[in-house]
Amino acid sequence: MVNHHQFWWRFFPKQELTQIYFSVALRSFAISLISIFIPLYLFQEKNLSFEQTLMFFIFYSVVFAVTMPLAAKFASRFGVKHSIIVGVPLYILFVALLHFFSSAVFQLLITSAVLGASQAFYWMGMHLAFFHASHRKHRGEEVGKRAGVTVLSTMLGPFIGGVLITFAGFKMVFALTVFLLLGSALLLLLNGDGYVPYHFSMKTVFDTKYWKDSLFFVSRGSHVIVQGVVWPLFIFFILKSYFSMGIIGSLMSLSSAILFWSVGRYSDHADKRKIMRWSSVVESGMWVLMALVKTIPQVFAVTVASSLVHAVRESPTGALEYDKAKGQVAAYFVNREIF
């Protein structure tokens, strides 16, 4: 007689890269329920000033960078998937702190620090796990698949989050996020935490060979802050609705999902650097247009256009990063996040 636990286990993915895709999808959906609304939650619901809201995310970035070397050492000793798993309870703690958040500066810094530590442990483990499971000749396609899966899974997240916040409040969204995050951790451990041998030394943090990439690293970080914090606040003043914000988030996902995979696959047989160069120029132009929007139709049009351009750029860029990091993956990504 087959044990019912063994029976259901057969339906879960067995290949490591597929497990990563599934886990990333579930986590991305969970976080997409609230991520676009976090700046608005702090600014609108908790009455923080724009400067305080920005300080929250700047401090998060600092903690993220400082914690990255610690996460790399942790992953080298306890396993890369355990590093990812550590990020889950930390993110759940962050959600709890958000729920009970007050405008006190101390609580603002603590909540921000927990988010930074959560992301550091998750992304250090994810970069290492993905590098180990992916294949160099197909890395453009595989990075594209990961990005595409992420985008597809977040397609309805902001919309659902906006509806739930509008009719049930933030508490319901926080609870659903926690439940889904636990599920993403379970998926990742289906094959255990296979040992991925690598070495990381704190000395690499000060290795000058990474300094030549500092402008690129800074541009990546700036994009995250502007896209995730400044842009949502900026367009909320135009849209004035959580529901509309949810639609915007879903549109961003819908417009770029297929492009991530198709451009990634194409880049495996083309000049990745050439794609990256011309798409970077176009994306810079998109940011100029985003600063000029004043009406709701303009918000929707520029959001879709910028998402498409970013999708073209991201897959070949991500593949080049993993290729460049070979041999010292942890050191490369630690330095990237510090800058």
Predicted regions and their residues:
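Helix-loop boundary and gating motifs at the non-cytosolic
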Residues: 3-65, 207-252
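Hydrophobic core of transmembrane alpha-helices in multi-pass small-molecule transporters
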Residues: 25, 105-122, 218, 297-313
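Conserved MFS/SLC helix-loop-helix module at the cytosolic interface between two early adjacent transmembrane helices
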Residues: 66-102
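Helix-to-loop junctions at the C-terminal end of transmembrane segments
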Residues: 66-80, 165, 258-272
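C-terminal ends and interior cores of transmembrane alpha-helices
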Residues: 89-103, 281-295, 299
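Cytoplasmic helix-loop-helix junction between adjacent transmembrane helices
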Residues: 113-150
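Intracellular juxtamembrane helix-capping segments at the cytosolic ends
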Residues: 121-135, 231, 311-327
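Symmetry-related core transmembrane helices of the 12-TM Major Facilitator Superfamily/SLC fold
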Residues: 172-190
